[in-house]
């Protein structure tokens, strides 16, 4: 999978994109990430990439010309790449969006900055916009990193265990169950006995119920779209009845 990132601050990506799973994916040839400095495509001698907004107002707006020139240079090599914009106006980037994006071969992400970007970038080039949450960031770079990290987990061969992406939190609409490893006891806190029993059916049942408990406690809104069977619904009813007593 190929990512091209259009940004004013390419150095921000050096740590997150050169460590851990992403680094190994790049080394194995499963992932290709290229950074493009938008400022390099400004044509004036001062390399200006922003200007005051028409109509007045606070902040500065990223100019359309440098972004267009940078994007067109990338598209000359990646004509089929899907063009995305990180923006608070975009749809929420979630696990389903990450899975969807992983089906693409080539993706271009434009990182917004300052007060925003000239609207003509959207009108002329952008195919989709994503937000990672209802909060303000200094720029779209952090959002782009989050999107890449979440997406590459669904690229075949990236994770060590093929099933990891399918059992992670949100994979079936629920928060994930608690995890434990050695030692079996630490400062009076023991690993649940069922996890040491060797009974795979009981372990699976415990994990499913804990996932339901975590979800109803922290993110009950997720249950509206979660994939639930009759046992799940019965257990949720028990939890609700217990909470009302």
From Swiss-Prot:
It is an enzyme of class 2 (transferase). Pfam families: tRNA_m1G_MT. GO terms for cellular component: cytosol. It comes from the Bacteria. Its EC number is 2.1.1.228. The keyword Metal-binding does not apply. The keyword S-adenosyl-L-methionine applies. GO terms for biological process: tRNA N1-guanine methylation. It catalyses: guanosine(37) in tRNA + S-adenosyl-L-methionine = N(1)-methylguanosine(37) in tRNA + S-adenosyl-L-homocysteine + H(+). One of its GO terms (molecular function) is tRNA (guanine(37)-N1)-methyltransferase activity. It is found in: Cytoplasm. S-adenosyl-L-methionine binds at residues 112, 132-137. Specifically methylates guanosine-37 in various tRNAs. Homodimer. This is tRNA (guanine-N(1)-)-methyltransferase. It comes from Geobacter metallireducens (strain ATCC 53774 / DSM 7210 / GS-15). The lineage of its organism: Bacteria, Pseudomonadati, Thermodesulfobacteriota, Desulfuromonadia, Geobacterales.
């Amino acid at each position: 999978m190929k990512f091209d990132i259009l940004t004013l601050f390419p150095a921000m990506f050096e740590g997150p994109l050169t460590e851990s799973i992403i680094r190994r994916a790049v080394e194995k040839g499963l992932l290709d990430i290229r950074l493009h400095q938008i400022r390099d495509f400004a044509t004036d001698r001062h390399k200006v990439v922003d200007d005051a907004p028409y109509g007045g107002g606070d902040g500065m707006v990223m100019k359309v010309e440098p972004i267009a020139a940078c994007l067109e240079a990338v598209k000359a090599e990646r004509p089929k790449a899907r063009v995305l914009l990180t923006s608070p106006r975009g749809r929420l980037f979630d696990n389903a969006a990450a899975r969807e994006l992983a089906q693409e071969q080539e993706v271009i992400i434009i990182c917004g900055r300052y007060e925003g970007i000239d609207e003509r970038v959207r009108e002329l080039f952008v195919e989709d916009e994503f937000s990672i949450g209802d909060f303000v960031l200094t720029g779209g770079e952090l959002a782009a990193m989050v999107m890449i990290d979440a997406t590459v987990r669904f690229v075949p061969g990236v994770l060590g265990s093929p099933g990891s992406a399918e059992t992670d939190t949100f994979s079936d609409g629920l928060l994930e169950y608690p995890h434990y490893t050695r030692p079996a006891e630490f400062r009076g806190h023991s690993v649940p006995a069922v996890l040491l029993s060797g009974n795979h059916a009981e372990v699976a049942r415990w994990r499913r119920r804990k996932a339901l408990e975590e979800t109803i406690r922290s993110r009950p809104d997720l249950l509206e779209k979660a994939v639930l069977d009759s046992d799940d619904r019965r257990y949720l009813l028990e939890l609700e009845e217990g909470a009302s007593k």
